[in-house]
Amino acid sequence: MSAAKSFPLVPQLPHSAAAVRHLVEAALPALGLALTGAQLDALFAYLDLISKWTRVYNLTAVRDPVEMVTHHLLDCLAALAPLAVHLEAARQLERAGPVLTPGLHAGQGSRLLDVGSGAGLPGVVIAICFPDVSVTCVDTVAKKAAFIKQVALTLKLPNLIGLHARVEALAAPGTAPFDVICSRAFASLADFTQWSSGALAPAGVWMAMKGKRPDDEMAALSQDIDVFHVEQLNVPALDAERCIVWMRKRAGLAG
């Protein structure tokens, strides 16, 4: 992933910072990623902000620096290569004809919504690694939305927006829809898709990050929803099952 802009220097991290950074750098090839030094600095600056805010606002239950990397950062980074594949495929379709993909925005990059974003996982990670993607992190908790705004300001991320709202409110007339709506350990697939359906572009997709393959949740989905792929993820240094459930509205029902 490339980025033309520069990020602020990474702040002072705990004594294990060098080892923790090496853990991330060593994991990148297995994740199919090639991040710049500036992007890595931004990711660790972001983790530092989470740590500072968590002391007051309890953004996350994970506080150990190594666990922050394995359970949060690497977990989110594991979703980036699959997301990149989807975005590139969507852009190829867009070049073939805008009628095929009316939800994509030519020349503006894709629009991604992270629902129930909390501390910004995975939304902030996506914004750092994909500077051409406009990322909106929405949460019903004001302090969490305020944190995302602070991250965008501190790390100078013009493609990152923090929004205090219910996701249902984003379906209002005149509101631009999203090409990808993602969530991570947020809600059941049925609730996730129902609540955010109005914000999804006609050719958009849902990207639900889950642990074990949620067969019961998939069986409970509305008939209007098509699960077109369940993608298994391998997260380095994390001995746990992870997957992405990719969904879309069935043909003839979008819009």
Where are the regions a protein language model picked out?
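Class I SAM-dependent transferase core
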Residues: 2-107, 143-144, 150-158
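Conserved class I S-adenosyl-L-methionine
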Residues: 99, 107-118
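Hydrophobic alpha-helical segments of small multi-pass membrane proteins
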Residues: 114-117, 121, 140-143
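Conserved SAM-binding loop of SAM-dependent methyltransferases across substrates and taxa
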Residues: 119-132
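S-adenosylmethionine
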Residues: 130-254
